[in-house]
Amino acid sequence: MRTLHVDLGERSYPIYIGENLLGDARWFAPHIVGRRVAVISNETVAPLYLETLLKALQGHEVTPVVLPDGEAYKQWETLQLIFDALLKERHDRKTTLIALGGGVIGDMAGFAAACYQRGVNFIQVPTTLLSQVDSSVGGKTGINHPLGKNMIGAFYQPQAVVIDTASLKTLPSRELSAGLAEVIKYGFICDEPFITWLEEHMDALLALEPTVVTEAIERSCAAKARVVGADERELGVRATLNLGHTFGHAIETQQGYGVWLHGEAVGAGTVMALEMSHRLGWLSAAERDRGTRLLRRAGLPVVPPAEMTAEDFMEHMAVDKKVLDGRLRLVLLQGLGNAVVTGDFPREILDATLRTDYRALADQLGDE
């Protein structure tokens, strides 16, 4: 078992990473302040792991709240089901919420914790690779709006993150690849040696070799913790964690939430960010292609939806949290391992990026 820390003064918290942590009270008891707990999960994860988690919560009065599964349910109506259950069972301010599931459950349970009686404690128990390496760490919580992804929410930190790597054994391969999009992101934005490590270990990651998976999660969480510790509320460097996300969120919104998995959209969006960085003269063609190959090896789409036009992208990208004073800002790369957030780019470069034939670029890479 490995422990990392997110350093935020009085709101600091541990990240526990290991196998078979879910049923062990040691990782939960120190972070539960009262007698009552509400476990927020979904119809896919609860049958797999709720019973195991309940073993760690013996001695507490537990209310399970099982929600529909999927990005399409990351909305106000589903959030209301959490509040309904908490109020019906008379949960008070000493209640601890536990998010048992992927990113959707973590985001909604965290937002519910931020809102319920103006704030109660919560613990993240992420069960997908994407949520383990990204969304469970850093305190971003919220729901989607029909006009934009994650536009309603709050910064609200958990008391702990408990990452049981054994939960990945039941993860579908498509979800595993989606999580690898966020793992690869850390190499692209701040850790070029990690890119080389991922190239060398991608087959082992896809095969879920335990030591390799644990190292990938630890390195990803350590990078996320450093960035969040330096910029909790995304006023500066934390925005670099959104590499590929502005393009990716446009894909998710246009296609309908849940049609493309978040990580899949980030994968294609990252290829677009690589291409734009190349067009600006910040990345060589070889670096662009290296990044694209790694994403493709992870099983991610490297071509955005063929039916999406440049105008479609611009319509959705205008509703983005990084837009300031009406100006679109993007996360781009000035070399692999060096991300920047900028709105200082020629509009024609962005337009050319949106109109690029990504299928032709992918075909030029050839087979692995």
UniProtKB/Swiss-Prot annotation:
Pathway: Metabolic intermediate biosynthesis; chorismate biosynthesis; chorismate from D-erythrose 4-phosphate and phosphoenolpyruvate: step 2/7. Zn(2+) binds at residues 182, 245, 262. GO terms for molecular function: 3-dehydroquinate synthase activity; metal ion binding; nucleotide binding. Keywords: Amino-acid biosynthesis, Aromatic amino acid biosynthesis, Cobalt, Cytoplasm, Lyase, Metal-binding, NAD, Nucleotide-binding, Zinc. GO terms for cellular component: cytoplasm. Its cofactor is Co(2+); Zn(2+); NAD(+). It comes from Pseudomonas aeruginosa (strain LESB58). The keyword Repeat does not apply. Catalyzes the conversion of 3-deoxy-D-arabino-heptulosonate 7-phosphate (DAHP) to dehydroquinate (DHQ). The keyword Cytoplasm applies. Belongs to the sugar phosphate cyclases superfamily. Dehydroquinate synthase family. It holds the Pfam family DHQ_synthase. InterPro entries: Dehydroquinate_synthase, DHQ_synth_AroB, DHQ_synth_fam, DHQS/DOIS_N, DHQS_C. NAD(+) binds at residues 69-74, 103-107, 127-128, 140, 149. One of its GO terms (biological process) is chorismate biosynthetic process. This is 3-dehydroquinate synthase.
